[in-house]
């Protein structure tokens, strides 16, 4: 059967049993996190009636995630990545079951919710970093685009469906069942993940953790391709913060309310899902760097145009296109970062790359929120998009190595082939 030049290539699931195991675990994990992400803020609000305390829990999750990324990156380049993945997933699952136990008692502890938010953020990020570092050796660098698209498709589907399912569970059975199901599903991911082979990092050199992390940062600065990709990715992360002004855009631009805001929030992931599903052509690009930077520049122009659009349908179409381009840019970032980073640095580079995405989104939200306080929301959106467009053009011109990168160079092997050794375990 010939591969479609348009749609994502599913053959990796058929022929690579290790990636198939990861895909199954990822689907279960996305579902678990989707129903959990609804439960925590709902329960805290029920217990305290305070949006501030809900925000504190979300902030603690973010802090845990950032620290987990930093620690996980160093650990993933030092220890067996399979062990780290299983350990992190198992501890996350136990944390969710602890939340279920806390919710079943007569007076649930808000402090326990705070602690578990930190716990989940830390171990979730640690496991994610180890898993991303293992992907190139499992699928081969030539299959990174397909692996990234399939993973992205899973996340997009989960982001749309799982929170809705979580809300239904809360309404029909109570928040305790969200935690219980999330814990069971997360521990259930250990079944497919236990099938993974031993995933020892290559060429490990003992070093102090801070020095090891610094080495990863130095690689980002010195490598013209990976450093440029991360810089462009930061700009894209800033653009994602436009959602902060969706309520103001709906009111001032479209004379709408909550219904219109909901449509706007749905348009972006819908476009992203279409982008992931129709990304079969990405792996064969002759100039992947140019397409990536071009996608971000056009995305910036779309954000600027939102400050000028006065029709809801046109605005929703623009947001869907924004999601589509963001999906393509993210997939190319994944492929280029994974494809140009040596195995011995994959943990640390992935941790720093994901951290900049988290920080970039937060800074973008803060910046556009502050801009909207001193100007009209529509003007703030236009100014934000125009500034991002200028920055994107400067990057496109300035990052010569990225612009001239060919598809053949993007798939160039950096390490010796990795021999995947079956893990002898009587379990599962």
PLM regions: where:
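Transmembrane alpha-helical cores of Major Facilitator Superfamily
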Residues: 27, 59, 63, 90, ...
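Helix-loop junctions on the cytosolic side of multi-pass membrane transporters
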Residues: 105-106, 133, 137, 179, ...
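C-terminal transmembrane bundle of multi-pass solute transporters/carriers
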Residues: 57, 66-71, 78, 82-88, ...
């Amino acid at each position: 059967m010939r591969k479609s030049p348009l749609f994502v290539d599913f053959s990796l699931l058929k022929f690579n049993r290790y990636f198939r195991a990861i895909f199954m675990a990822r689907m279960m994990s996305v579902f678990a996190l989707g129903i959990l992400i609804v439960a925590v803020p709902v329960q805290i609000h029920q217990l305290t009636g305070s949006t501030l305390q809900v925000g504190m829990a979300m902030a603690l999750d973010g802090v845990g995630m950032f620290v987990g990324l930093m620690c996980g990156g160093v650990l993933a380049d030092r220890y067996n990545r399979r062990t780290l993945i299983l350990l992190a997933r198992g501890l996350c699952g136990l944390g969710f079951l602890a939340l279920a136990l806390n919710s079943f008692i007569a007076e649930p502890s808000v402090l326990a919710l705070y602690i578990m938010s930190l716990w989940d953020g830390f171990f979730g990020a640690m496991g994610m970093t180890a898993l991303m570092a293992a992907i190139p050796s499992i699928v081969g660098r030539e299959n990174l685009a397909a692996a990234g698209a399939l993973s992205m498709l899973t996340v997009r589907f989960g982001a749309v469906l799982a929170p809705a399912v979580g809300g239904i569970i809360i309404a029909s059975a109570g928040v305790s069942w969200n935690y219980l199901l999330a814990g069971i599903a997360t521990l259930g991911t250990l079944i497919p993940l236990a099938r993974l082979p031993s995933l020892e990092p290559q060429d490990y050199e003992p070093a102090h953790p801070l020095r090891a992390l610094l080495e990863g940062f130095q690689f980002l600065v010195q490598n013209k391709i990976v450093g440029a990709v991360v810089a462009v990715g930061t700009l894209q992360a800033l653009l994602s913060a436009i959602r902060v002004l969706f309520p103001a855009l709906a009111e001032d631009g479209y004379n709408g309310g909550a219904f219109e805001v909901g449509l706007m929030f749905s348009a972006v992931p819908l476009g992203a899902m279409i982008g992931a599903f129709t990304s079969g052509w990405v792996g064969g690009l002759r100039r992947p760097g140019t397409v990536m930077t071009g996608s971000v520049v056009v995305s910036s122009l779309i954000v600027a145009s939102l400050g000028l659009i006065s029709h809801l349908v046109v605005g929703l179409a623009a947001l869907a296109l924004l999601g589509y381009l963001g999906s393509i840019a993210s997939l190319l970032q994944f492929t280029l970062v994974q494809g140009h980073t040596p195995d011995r640095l994959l943990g640390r580079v992935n941790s720093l790359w994901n951290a900049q995405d988290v920080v970039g989104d937060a800074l973008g939200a803060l910046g556009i929120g502050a801009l909207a306080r001193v100007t009209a929301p529509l003007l703030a959106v236009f100014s934000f998009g125009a500034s991002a467009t200028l920055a994107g053009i400067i990057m496109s011109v300035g990052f010569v190595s990225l612009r001239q990168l060919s598809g053949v160079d993007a798939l160039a092997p950096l390490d010796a082939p990795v021999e995947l050794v079956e893990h002898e375990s009587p379990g599962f």
